[in-house]
């Protein structure tokens, strides 16, 4: 078991990581001040069928505990479910001393966190992640829902009271979700922990290696990368944008292909490869792009789809939150462990995307 301390300007809290940390949940809730009045667990159908009762049983508290369950899938991070969650909260008499538990992956963490951020102008919540991908989204306080015109466009910054990362919950994940989450692990290694990057190349030959002590090691190394960035820039005014490495194209792919047709991690993996491909041209450096491409393909990450319209992707990349005055801003890599936000012309991105698309045959 390992505890990772997160410190931001607005709040300090711990991430509890391990095989038995669910037992910490009762103490976490009981120690909150002012005392918690009641507890709302927000989850999705897939996770609830596997883990909801386990969490309710582990949560040995006197307060009223109830659940609100939405269908599974990124498209459910919608205004309709956000509104319905508020209705459920009001019907069950949540108040300003209530607590929301986000039980699920990144979609649920974002949705439940935004409900917590907005209900009565903000109440407390705890993240209980059930995916590897959520090692990224559960930490840092960014919560949001999607808009038909863009991912995570309606949201807030709202830090949790704690994150309880009970690793046995991850064992029920399908392979595509392991791969999706592992992409964010790779991202954290590439931008902030070169030693972890080399460890991954040596120790994680297949996704089947992501278990037990190796999994806990990965989580306790990757999460501090994000924690360090968030401590410097809680509200994404500067270096926190570095955590968007691979996301400019990744989000565009998710939007173009349709949420659920490509996982977030698969999109980010393609986006990271493109960022490295473009970085070599912009910085005139050798980042071993070809080796990186083969490494990604070994894990089963997809290639850049050949049938996608490049100009359409360019326009979607201009809708990215880092864009400024209509110009694309991407996180590019100067060297492993050193990244910067760079303004790139539409023409440069278009030419590079066409070349990248052809290279990914």
Curated annotation (Swiss-Prot):
Named in its record, the pathway it takes part in is:
Metabolic intermediate biosynthesis; chorismate biosynthesis; chorismate from D-erythrose 4-phosphate and phosphoenolpyruvate: step 2/7
Give binding positions for NAD(+). Answer: 72-77, 130-131, 142, 151
Q: Which reaction does it catalyse?
A: 7-phospho-2-dehydro-3-deoxy-D-arabino-heptonate = 3-dehydroquinate + phosphate
Q: Which Gene3D superfamilies match?
A: 3.40.50.1970, Dehydroquinate synthase-like - alpha domain
Pfam families per the UniProt record, alphabetical? DHQ_synthase (PF01761), DHQS_C (PF24621)
Keyword flag Cytoplasm? yes
GO cellular component terms, semicolon-separated: cytoplasm
Sum up the protein's function in the record's words.
Catalyzes the conversion of 3-deoxy-D-arabino-heptulosonate 7-phosphate (DAHP) to dehydroquinate (DHQ).
Q: Its family? A: Belongs to the sugar phosphate cyclases superfamily. Dehydroquinate synthase family.
User: Mind telling me what this protein is named?
Assistant: 3-dehydroquinate synthase
Annotated organism of origin: Bacillus cereus (strain B4264)
Protein encoded by which gene: aroB
């Amino acid at each position: 078991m390992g505890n990772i301390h997160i410190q931001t300007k607005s709040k300090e809290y711990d991430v509890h990581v391990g095989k038995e940390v669910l037992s910490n949940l009762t103490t976490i809730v009981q120690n909150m001040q002012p005392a918690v009045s009641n507890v709302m667990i927000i989850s999705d159908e897939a996770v609830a069928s596997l883990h909801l009762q386990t969490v309710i049983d582990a949560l040995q508290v006197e307060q009223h505990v109830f659940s609100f369950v939405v269908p599974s899938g990124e498209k459910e991070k919608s205004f309709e479910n956000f509104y319905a969650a508020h209705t459920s909260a009001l019907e069950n008499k949540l108040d300003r001393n209530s607590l929301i538990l986000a039980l699920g992956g990144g979609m649920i963490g974002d949705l439940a966190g935004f409900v917590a951020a907005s209900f009565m102008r903000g109440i407390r919540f705890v993240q209980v992640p059930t995916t590897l991908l959520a090692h990224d989204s559960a930490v840092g306080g960014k919560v949001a829902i999607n808009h038909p015109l863009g991912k995570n466009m309606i949201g807030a910054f709202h830090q949790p009271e704690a994150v309880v990362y009970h690793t046995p919950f991850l064992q029920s994940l399908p392979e595509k979700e392991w791969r999706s989450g592992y992409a964010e692990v790779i991202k954290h290694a590439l931008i902030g922990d070169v030693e972890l990057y080399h460890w991954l190349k040596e120790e994680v030959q297949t996704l089947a290696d992501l278990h037990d002590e190796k999994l806990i090691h990965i989580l306790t190394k990757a999460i501090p990368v994000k924690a360090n960035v968030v401590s410097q820039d809680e509200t994404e005014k500067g270096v926190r944008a570095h955590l968007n490495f691979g996301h400019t194209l990744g989000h565009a792919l998710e939007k173009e292909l349709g949420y659920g047709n490509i996982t977030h991690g698969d999109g980010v993996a393609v986006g990271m490869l493109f960022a490295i491909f473009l970085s070599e041209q912009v910085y005139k450096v050798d980042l071993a792009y070809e080796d990186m491409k083969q490494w990604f393909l070994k894990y089963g990450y997809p290639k850049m789809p050949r049938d996608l319209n490049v100009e359409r992707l360019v326009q979607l990349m201009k809708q990215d939150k880092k864009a400024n005055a209509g110009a694309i801003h991407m996180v590019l890599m100067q060297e492993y462990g050193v990244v910067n936000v760079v303004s790139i012309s539409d023409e440069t991105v278009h030419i590079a995307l066409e070349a990248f698309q052809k290279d990914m045959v």
